[in-house]
């Protein structure tokens, strides 16, 4: 993407072909001399944060210190859970099938109705805690059979395996605590980027 910049203002943006549809270039590529003569500059991009943690919205192309820059708005996602509500602010509930609901004469019974369980919009802390638990469960699943064997037949779990499993559980607990203590999205991202799961020996 390029921009034509004249008198400290962007007058047009697009590809070279879009900006100069009637001009042909040797080798099909505009050289730097042409770009300079026509006041063409490459568009650079402002910061785009990790979209796991931020809602990223593309904005306008603006001049920043004379450089055409594609702007982005990075809005942090919500950390905590919140009640799900409709457009009028009414609480939403998890729906269940009521097989006995009477729909009137000549109609089959049954309807989806509200339960007493609130519908919740999960925040990042809940989402990341679930991911951490899933990782721990996946790592432990490989040796769960040894735990079952120990319980059912009293066959000892190898010490290396016991140490590994304990380390997985410890790391999971550490991460859950750190996630819960994260004060903002950047702190939460730092926790998730610093996961230190043990390696099997």
Regions found by a protein language model. Give the residues of each.
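Exposed beta-sheet edge/beta-hairpin loop segments within beta-rich domains
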Residues: 150-157
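Short Gly/Pro-enriched loop/turn and capping motifs at secondary-structure junctions
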Residues: 152, 169-170
């Amino acid at each position: 993407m390029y921009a034509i910049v004249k008198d400290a203002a962007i007058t047009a943006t697009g590809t070279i072909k879009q900006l100069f549809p009637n001009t042909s270039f040797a080798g099909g590529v505009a050289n730097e001399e042409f770009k300079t003569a026509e006041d063409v500059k490459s568009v650079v991009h402002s910061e785009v944060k990790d979209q796991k943690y931020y809602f990223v919205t593309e904005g306008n192309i603006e001049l920043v210190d004379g450089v055409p820059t594609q702007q982005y708005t990075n809005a942090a996602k919500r950390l905590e859970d919140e009640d799900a509500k409709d457009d009028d602010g009414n609480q939403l509930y998890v729906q269940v099938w009521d097989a006995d609901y009477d729909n009137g004469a000549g109609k089959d019974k049954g309807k989806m109705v509200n339960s007493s369980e609130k519908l919740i919009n999960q925040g990042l802390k809940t989402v990341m805690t679930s991911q951490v638990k899933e990782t721990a469960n996946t790592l432990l699943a490989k040796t769960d059979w040894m735990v079952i064997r120990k319980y059912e037949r009293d066959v000892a779990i190898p010490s290396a395996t016991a140490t590994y499993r304990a380390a997985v559980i410890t790391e999971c607990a550490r991460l859950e605590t750190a996630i819960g203590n994260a004060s903002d999205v950047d702190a939460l991202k730092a926790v998730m980027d610093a996961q230190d799961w043990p390696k099997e020996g």
